[in-house]
């Protein structure tokens, strides 16, 4: 990766992130900034966009102590790190000189954000046509043709070429495989890591586990609802409105975490749950479809579209009764998470 870049003592790394937002993607971007600063002694600046510009740093990211840039110096000595969503790409397209890197934190959200952009474009076009003013129609046509060339993804490689990225980094093997399949050049793996709080949890030692199944209410909503209704004799608990410390406690005292979401990248919560000792059961969408991103035995993965509820119920019963046996089956996955 570094061979594709021109890095000097005066190089500034700019990292794009939404202002005052605490979710998986922004967490990874702040962790990257912290790693570049701490491990390589690079000059790093966070560039925030969005509505909370006056107070852009979420309180959970203040610990990284990363300086904020008000403006990006667009010169070939500097480097811009962008995520894959359209908000980031909109900022990238106007910067012509800076060295640009795209970090694929997901595959699915890239396409979802592009579709949303196209919907907005089409609505705007209809509105301008409705006005029926020739001069506006001429201007709008030029603008929309340019946008269409950039964002209609008939050829991913050609579309990305228009942004002039020096290289592409992939947080998951799922993303890496997708880019290689689409003949994208200069593609490299760059995983993230779990927060230190998940590795230093000695005060939770000795806690007894309960027959509880955890789930993320924002992931795989329809399938999860179906599972909860079909298997109503079990206790399900959603991970919602908890502090990070409370989540750790929950994962250390529950036996199972299920995730039948889209897995657009190498999701954080399944790794957290597995590392803290829970057994995880997933579907086979996105990054869960391969044995690299979620490297767990196949018996713990189910076809999202044809769930065998009898097998799922038998597996849950077995985990509850023989937890010490099942949790050992995740030791390889835990070691991998520890070494990320």
Predicted feature locations:
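N-terminal pre-catalytic "stem/leader" segment of glycosyltransferase-like enzymes
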Residues: 1-79, 83, 178, 281, ...
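Conserved catalytic-core segment of nucleotide-activated headgroup transferases in glycan assembly
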Residues: 25-28, 145-247
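Short, polar loop motifs at secondary-structure junctions
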Residues: 49-52, 82-89, 107, 171-177, ...
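Alpha-helix C-terminal capping/helix-to-coil transition sites in glycosyltransferase folds
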Residues: 75-77, 164, 252-253
């Amino acid at each position: 990766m570094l061979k594709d870049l021109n890095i000097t003592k005066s190089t500034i790394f700019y990292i794009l992130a939404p202002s005052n937002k605490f979710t998986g993607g922004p967490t990874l971007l702040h962790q990257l900034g912290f790693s570049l600063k701490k491990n390589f002694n690079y000059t790093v600046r966070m560039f925030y966009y969005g509505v909370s510009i006056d107070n852009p740093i979420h309180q959970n990211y203040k610990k990284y102590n990363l300086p904020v840039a008000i403006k990006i110096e667009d010169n070939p000595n500097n480097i811009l790190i962008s995520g894959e969503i359209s908000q980031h790409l909109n900022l990238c397209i106007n910067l012509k000189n800076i060295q640009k890197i795209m970090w694929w934190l997901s595959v699915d959200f890239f396409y979802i954000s592009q579709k949303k952009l196209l919907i907005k474009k089409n609505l705007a076009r209809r509105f301008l046509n409705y006005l029926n003013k020739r001069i506006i129609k001429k201007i709008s046509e030029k603008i929309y043709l340019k946008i269409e060339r950039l964002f209609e993804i008939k050829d991913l490689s050609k579309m990305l070429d228009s942004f002039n990225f020096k290289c592409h980094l992939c947080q998951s093997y799922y993303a890496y495989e997708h880019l290689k399949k689409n003949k994208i050049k200069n593609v490299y793996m760059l995983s993230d890591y779990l927060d230190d709080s998940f590795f230093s949890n000695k005060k939770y030692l000795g806690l007894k586990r309960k027959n509880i199944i955890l789930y993320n209410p924002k992931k795989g909503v329809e399938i999860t609802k179906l599972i909860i209704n079909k298997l109503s004799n079990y206790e399900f608990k959603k991970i919602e409105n908890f502090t990070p410390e409370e989540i750790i406690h929950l994962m250390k005292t529950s036996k199972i975490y299920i995730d039948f979401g889209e897995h657009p990248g190498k999701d954080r919560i399944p790794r957290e749950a597995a590392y803290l000792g829970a057994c995880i059961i997933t579907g086979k969408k996105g990054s869960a479809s391969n044995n690299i991103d979620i490297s767990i035995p196949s018996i713990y993965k189910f076809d999202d579209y044809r769930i065998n509820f009898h097998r799922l119920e038998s597996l849950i019963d077995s985990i509850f009764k023989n937890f010490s046996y099942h949790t050992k089956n995740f030791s390889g996955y835990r070691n991998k998470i520890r070494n990320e």
